[in-house]
A protein has these predicted regions:
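Histidine/acidic-residue-rich catalytic or RNA/ligand-binding cores of hydrolases
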Residues: 31-33, 56, 77, 95-101
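Short amphipathic alpha-helices and their capping/turn segments at secondary-structure boundaries
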Residues: 74-82
């Protein structure tokens, strides 16, 4: 049932040409398999990713983008290609600026470099 609803959401994302934001718990392998089967044109973004670098690598190889929040794995944050990275405050009471600062430090970026990269990445949502 959940997979059927997910596939319906994928169809909507494709029809309306919108990225798909995905909260995935204990189903990364199946999600990766579905992406291969469906071969979507629109970006798929894993929201609130807390996984290990190996999982991040699997997702990136399969074509996903990854969004990090307050509770991120530092090694994973370093391993995600800059053009596949998003940052969020969904799960946090911290200001987004604090989350940016923590992720920039983990990646060895300045806050300005990270903010500019995320702004470029946001273009998958349309013009900004």
């Amino acid at each position: 049932m959940q997979e059927q609803i997910f596939i319906a959401q994928v169809k909507l994302a494709e029809e309306y040409k919108k990225p798909l934001i995905i909260h995935c718990v204990k189903a990364l392998d199946r999600l990766i398999a579905l992406r291969k089967i469906i071969a979507p044109q629109q970006p798929w973004i894993i929201h609130g990713f807390r996984g290990k670098p190996q999982q991040a690598a699997q997702l990136i190889k399969a074509g996903f983008h990854i969004s990090l929040g307050e509770h991120f794995n530092r090694e994973s944050a370093k391993s995600i290609p800059a053009d596949k990275l998003f940052i969020e405050s969904d799960e946090s009471r911290l200001p987004i600026a604090d989350i940016y600062t923590a992720i920039a430090a983990a990646r060895g970026f300045t806050l300005e470099e990270l903010a500019e990269q995320i702004e470029r990445n946001m273009r998958i949502f349309g013009q900004f």
